[in-house]
């Protein structure tokens, strides 16, 4: 057993922002457009596009909206002025934070990101200052009372990296990014339906927070995710049970 699930930390940090559906849709449409521009409109041959379309469906975005965003990115050059940039820094209690952005003005974006850090007892770092503390992985989470033995069996058969059973009975299966689709499809083929599945960024080690620091870290996350240019915020914060 290993505490609460990785998705519990990710989900809680995103919960307040996800309530602002209009802003969430705007960010997803931007990401869909860029993914289609860079990799084409065929979801089967564009893993990045497939991943963000899955997120869009999970957020209850209408299919027509998704299709229009894909067509716009693949056909019209929409999103050509957007560049990807990642900022790294430290939050309260030395929590490592990475901020992924899509922007048409890096000077504006870095100023806004720096302001959020400074307002929440943090500071913006240099490139590479915290990236080594994270790794990109597929994360497939199953709810409590799932068939642990069957999940473990399939995971071993198809080459999952790790399987962890959490205190609440949920199960996390982690994969290499390139194996994510194969393993998720194998689970579904075995009638094992995850409550959540995505390629994300996971911390190699976590920093435990007390209640005050956790609230401050959540404030920083909310301020960052409220910025139009910010797509994702990752941290190695381990939130206490009382705020989850």
From Swiss-Prot:
Pfam families: TACO1_YebC_N, Transcrip_reg. Keywords: Cytoplasm, DNA-binding, Transcription, Transcription regulation. GO terms for biological process: regulation of DNA-templated transcription. It is found in: Cytoplasm. InterPro entries: Integrase-like_N, TACO1_YebC-like_2nd/3rd_dom, TACO1_YebC_N, Transcrip_reg_TACO1-like, Transcrip_reg_TACO1-like_dom3, YebC-like. GO terms for molecular function: DNA binding. GO terms for cellular component: cytosol. NCBIfam families: PRK00110.1 (NF001030), PRK12378.1 (NF009044), YebC/PmpR family DNA-binding transcriptional regulator (TIGR01033). Belongs to the TACO1 family. This is Probable transcriptional regulatory protein CBU_1566. It comes from Coxiella burnetii (strain RSA 493 / Nine Mile phase I).
């Amino acid at each position: 057993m290993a505490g609460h699930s990785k998705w519990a930390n990710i989900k809680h940090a995103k919960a307040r922002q996800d309530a602002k559906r209009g802003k969430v849709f705007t960010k997803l449409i931007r990401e869909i457009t860029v993914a289609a521009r860079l990799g084409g409109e065929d979801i089967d041959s564009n893993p990045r596009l497939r991943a963000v379309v899955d997120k869009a469906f999970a957020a209850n975005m209408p299919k027509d909206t998704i299709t229009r965003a894909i067509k716009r990115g693949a056909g019209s050059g929409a999103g050509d002025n957007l560049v990807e940039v990642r900022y790294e820094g430290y939050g309260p209690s030395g929590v490592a934070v990475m901020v992924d952005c899509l922007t048409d003005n890096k000077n504006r974006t870095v100023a806004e990101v720096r302001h959020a850090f400074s307002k929440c007892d943090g500071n913006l770092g240099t490139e590479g200052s915290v990236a080594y503390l994270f790794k990109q992985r597929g994360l497939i989470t199953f709810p409590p009372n799932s068939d642990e033995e069957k999940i473990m069996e399939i995971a071993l058969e198809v080459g999952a990296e790790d399987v962890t059973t959490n205190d609440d009975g949920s199960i996390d299966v982690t994969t290499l990014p390139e194996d994510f689709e194969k393993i998720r499809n194998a689970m579904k083929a075995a009638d094992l339906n995850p409550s959540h599945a995505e390629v994300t960024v996971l911390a190699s080690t976590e920093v435990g927070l007390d209640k005050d620091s956790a609230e401050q870290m959540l404030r920083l996350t909310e301020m960052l995710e409220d910025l139009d240019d910010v797509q994702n915020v990752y941290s190695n914060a381990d939130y206490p049970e009382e705020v989850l």
